[in-house]
């Protein structure tokens, strides 16, 4: 859990902004959205596999684009 200590003479909105930023860096909101509803293990594996395939395709396309460029 991110903790933000409010400094002396610091406006509330600045402290709130720092807290939101630390929550975003910690990934709390995305974790809450992910856990909002139960997801079957097969669905989790299927989604992870699809993400891995997408990353691999993106990597290959970047490598091919690098080879094609002939300056």
From Swiss-Prot:
Keywords tagged on the record: Ribonucleoprotein, Ribosomal protein
What is the top-level taxon of the source organism? Bacteria
- Biased composition annotated in UniProt, kind: Basic residues: 43-59
Keyword S-adenosyl-L-methionine listed: no
Coiled-coil stretches, from where to where? none
Q: Compositional bias (Basic and acidic residues) spans? A: 60-71
The terms describing its cellular component in GO are: ribonucleoprotein complex; ribosome
Q: Report the protein name in the record.
A: Small ribosomal subunit protein bS21
PANTHER family per the UniProt record, alphabetical: MITOCHONDRIAL 28S RIBOSOMAL PROTEIN S21, SMALL RIBOSOMAL SUBUNIT PROTEIN BS21
Region (Disordered), start-end ranges:
38-71
- Describe the family membership recorded for this protein in Swiss-Prot or TrEMBL: Belongs to the bacterial ribosomal protein bS21 family.
State the organism of origin. Aliivibrio fischeri (strain ATCC 700601 / ES114) (Vibrio fischeri)
The gene that this protein is the product of is rpsU
Q: Which GO terms describe its biological process?
A: translation
Looking up InterPro entries in the UniProt record yields: Ribosomal_bS21 (IPR001911), Ribosomal_bS21_CS (IPR018278), Ribosomal_bS21_sf (IPR038380)
- Database matches in HAMAP family: Ribosomal_bS21
Q: Which GO molecular-function terms appear in the entry?
A: structural constituent of ribosome
Tell me yes or no: is Ribonucleoprotein among this UniProt entry's keywords.
Answer: yes
